Amino acid sequence: MTRTVKCRKYNEELPGLDRPPYPGAKGQDIFEHISQKAWKEWQDHQTMLINEKRLNMMNAEDRKFIQAEMDKFFAGEDYAQAEGYVPPSN
C-alpha cells in the first residue's frame, strides 16, 4: 500500500516519498509533507536552475540559494525561474 501525505504544495493527499531525501530535520519534514509529484517537479526545476544559472553545488552560497528556492517552491511562493523560461500550460 502506498503511503500518502498531505502535500504542502498541492494541499491534498498524494503518494509520499519512499524515504527522506536528506538526512536530518529538513529531510524528515520533506518526507512527511511533500508528495512524490511535488518532489519530482522540484528536482526538474532545481536541475534547470543549476544549469541555467551555472550554480556550483560545491559553493555554499549556491547551496543556500537552492535551499531557499526549494522552500519557496514547496510553500507556493514566488520562486526563481530560468531567464526566458515559460512553463507549459496545462
Curated annotation (Swiss-Prot):
InterPro entries listed in its UniProt record: Fe_traffick_prot_YggX (IPR007457), Fe_traffick_prot_YggX_sf (IPR036766)
Alphabetical GO biological process terms: cellular response to oxidative stress
Name of the molecule in the record: Probable Fe(2+)-trafficking protein
Pfam families per UniProt: Iron_traffic (PF04362)
Cellular compartments per GO CC: cytosol
Family in the record: Belongs to the Fe(2+)-trafficking protein family.
Known role: Could be a mediator in iron transactions between iron acquisition and iron-requiring processes, such as synthesis and/or repair of Fe-S clusters in biosynthetic enzymes.
Keyword Coiled coil: no
Protein keywords: Iron
HAMAP family: Fe_traffic_YggX
Phylogenetic lineage: Bacteria, Pseudomonadati, Pseudomonadota, Gammaproteobacteria, Pseudomonadales
GO MF term list: iron ion binding
